[in-house]
Amino acid sequence: MFESKINPLWQSFILAVQEEVKPALGCTEPISLALAAAAAAAELDGTVERIDAWVSPNLMKNGMGVTVPGTGMVGLPIAAALGALGGNAKAGLEVLKDASAKAVADAKAMLAAGHVAVMLQEPCNDILFSRAKVYRGDSWACVTIVGDHTNIVRIETDKGVVFTQADNAQEEEKTSPLGVLSHTSLEEILAFVNAVPFDAIRFILDAARLNGALSQEGLRGSWGLHIGSTLAKQCDRGLLAKDLSTAILIRTSAASDARMGGATLPAMSNSGSGNQGITATVPVMVVAEHVGADDERLARALMLSHLSAIYIHHQLPRLSALCAATTAAMGAAAGMAWLIDGRYDTIAMAISSMIGDVSGMICDGASNSCAMKVSTSASAAWKAVLMALDDTAVTGNEGIVAHNVEQSISNLCSLACRSMQQTDKQIIEIMASKAH
């Protein structure tokens, strides 16, 4: 069928999106530890009695203040316990989707008994690291995840090593679909979006379905900081206009409210983050509805948004001091601009203005307040699009923005990769001091 019309670069683009845009139930950092615990528990006969876990500072940062779905509790210990007692290790980022009420109760009892310990891995050279060691009597099993939220690199039990990842995994990364993104450009991504057969990218509509459902749930319930529902009330009071800009703000923040507040609905994630997936999806959906886009046009806009977000985030550490809702919103800006205008110059100007606007937003851990940053990023994206439609943008004479968008992206990402490392350490120190 359509495979014969797709060149190798386009195939890599599609595979990259399929790798990075996946359903995820719950914030992905605690879920990574839950997955390690579930995979370790699968190696034991019988019920886990005790858990020791170790995580990297960045994973600790993103796991301290976020609600684990179905538990009403925050933090890594409940994620580890529920993963071990009710998780499905084969479900990846949806490891907790089938956890029963009994498993939740048993996990809470395990915590209350003091049988779960989560510690910093020291020293730790990996930005994303989670290890869970589970015990039953004299038996134990240990699973280590490194580099990516679901990348199991080692499984070991009291009987010996069960699995260890091949040493050439990093070399294979260079030729993987994600590795190809290091040698492409936004112009090539746009050419792909404009010409790829619809059937080859129809799958991206699942992002609209899942994240749209989260948005509706966020408006129905009182999740997290309930930013979306609060702003909707202000519309009814006449304090906010009921217009397209407000709809983008409300519906995007509502999805993040539900996500961070512990709703038992999956998000379609991007680059290992549900909030990035929400930010790359919902603003584009709202604009698509406004312009009356059909499924094909929506799919192309979503593909541009998600692939642009992946392209930018691929130049960043998996976790850093930079709030990646901002980079996901750059993808959303591309998708929204494409729906209205379609020109590369408009898309490039919108992204450049985003870099000149929200590039300094820090990540101070996953929490309900992420919805604030998601809403800010979504609003900034729409503002940047409106400016670009009038042929206006932050120029290369200003700040870190360069005269071409590719260099602007590189400048932004170099900040996160180098200069913001000390910022990240300071954020983690501040958060750790609050925990004591």
UniProtKB/Swiss-Prot annotation:
GO terms for molecular function: L-cysteine desulfhydrase activity. GO terms for biological process: L-cysteine catabolic process to pyruvate. It comes from the Bacteria. InterPro entries: Ser_deHydtase-like_asu, UPF0597. Belongs to the UPF0597 family. HAMAP family: UPF0597. PANTHER family: UPF0597 PROTEIN YHAM. This is UPF0597 protein YhaM. It comes from Salmonella schwarzengrund (strain CVM19633). The gene is yhaM.
